[in-house]
């Protein structure tokens, strides 16, 4: 048993205690620490702190000594430690005190979370309150010194609170003070000093009360009084920033609530919800059904069985796995299980090698399917290449899984591709599908590259205005022999229908692409020859057409100019079958003698006898072509030449052509007459060549629909009309046409031969927005309409029904037809206007005033159309 050790300083004297401190802190220090008086005195200070902190507490009988007294006792006790004999210790202590005041001090002004309280400390040897602070050490950073001093004095770590740019710096008495501003320190923290005999008290003080009473107290708040103003400004600024942040956060929250953003219901992605619904519905799909005749033979899941495991992993990997997408969403093509007389088959053996990460086991695949016994007739065969294993009944209980919902392995594998496809469908709008792209490409290839046989056959079939024009200048699709056997079935059947027109190309194509000047144009020549003879002087002015109104007015001034010895060349940009012929084509082919007679002023055209038919002109013009048309072509050309032109004029260019089976001919004529005339070009006195915009805006028609339109007009002349329809037709003819409201600029009007036109018609062309000053009375219209109604009520004669059968074999030797006489009547109207309007040229007439109402703009055109219609009906009803 040993005696307890006692503290050696318990009963020592002051001299023994000071000797111990001299040995500890002064004599054994490095020589460089004793190089100057200040450094040596720092070691004296450390010894004094040890005496106060430890020795004095161990031996309370020892006296309390401050630094000056302690330094005087040490120097007097051991004079060798004081190397500077010429330096008075008292003077050295004063110098050391000044040096200590020059050492920078780093501290922190600590505020709570609400910035209304500040933390202050009180020293043991001082009666004033100040910030926790301390002197900076050698080569120490300011922030590190602040953190260290605060940790020593109050025991709180400011590493996560202090900011380098938030501080207040002052120089007081030659000493630099840098106090960092810290906020957000918890007020309930238990502060405790880490050093001895240095900090006596630590308290939270109300900052606003302190700022108001700090100047009244006498030195109770050291260093705080000199920094209270900047501290107040910083606190106000921080509160303002904090208030703005709170206001912004509050406003953002309120705005989100109003807009419904940020709520839990809207946080979920609707697309993801939809995908989850689809995946859950696919995952919980009904059990697979195996049947030979699609009968609903359900698979029982009450007593699930297991499939025998594969023998080894290497053996299962040797089998080539089947693609998981091959059976996605479809029943597996496996027979009913088990099959009598056959070995056990593992239908899902391919899943083990390719999808081992999906299922729990690697050596076996379990399923909850209970395959029914083989009661239905067996129709399906086992999957070729499947591995056959013997039945191992002893392993069923070991691998029997719990009851789980039926899930197909292929469905689990295919969820990701289906989700990606659904996302692509949701992101990308669906593009319109082209149903029969091959048909359009085939037609475009036929139109762009016509064969020589098609080009040759185009000359043998006469062309009409309603036919669909091909890619070449004057050829028509009616003349091309399209092999429907090479086309798709839907295309071949649609081309065979009589009431369906197939637009083979866009009418907006350029004229340069549509013109082939070196091709023979037999059908076009036949049509042009008949048109030149029938229409007379109007065709001679087609070479002068210009798209501007100034040229149109100049043509009106030079109405007496003659164009003798000039053949007809259509140079307009119209895409119709009459205007696709180029000037080069007209010059290259041998031209026959022009059958045009230009009438001078006052001269009239001698009418031909009714016995002369228009077949002579048609056959003569067709004789110049490479082939002579057959008798059937001539007869069809006689019927199509006038009837088709009349139907084209009567029908509105803005409305699509109705089907023959849907509307009767009488109803079609009534609907046409009921429509307001949109422009003056619908007048019958102006031929189809003058209406430049008709063919550009209206779709082209096939030869099948053209023949149907010809038969429509023949049936109209043959069949008697109903009483209601005749009355409606009479009301239409007696009523003046209403203004269509369409204002047509003069710059878009084509050039019209004003010298040989009616005066009111020329005035209407020059001023399309104003009515003519001289209105034609409605008496002629009423009389003509009554006569038209009387003709329509009469039943068609037998000779009229047999008109197309009386065509002679040789059309060259026959006189002109009734169509020529009808055109002569039109020419007489052009050359010899009525006496009520024969008062001068259009230039001599006073121009219509702009203040007049345009309600009677097309009265003259309607009267002329009715007169020409009556003339055609009279001649067609006359028995030869």
Swiss-Prot record:
A motif (Nudix box) lies at residues 134-155. Residues 293-317, 446-485, 548-638, 736-755, 824-862 are annotated as: Disordered. Its EC number is 3.-.-.-. GO terms for biological process: deadenylation-dependent decapping of nuclear-transcribed mRNA; deadenylation-independent decapping of nuclear-transcribed mRNA; mRNA processing; nuclear-transcribed mRNA catabolic process, nonsense-mediated decay; positive regulation of transcription initiation by RNA polymerase II; stress granule assembly. It is found in: Cytoplasm, P-body. It is an enzyme of class 3 (hydrolase). Residues 475-485, 548-580, 737-750 have a biased composition (Polar residues). Keywords: Cytoplasm, Hydrolase, Manganese, Metal-binding, mRNA processing, Nonsense-mediated mRNA decay, RNA-binding. One of its GO terms (molecular function) is 5'-(N(7)-methylguanosine 5'-triphospho)-[mRNA] hydrolase activity. Residues 590-599 have a biased composition (Basic residues). Its main location: cytoplasm. This is mRNA-decapping enzyme subunit 2. PANTHER family: M7GPPPN-MRNA HYDROLASE. One of its GO terms (cellular component) is cytoplasmic side of membrane.
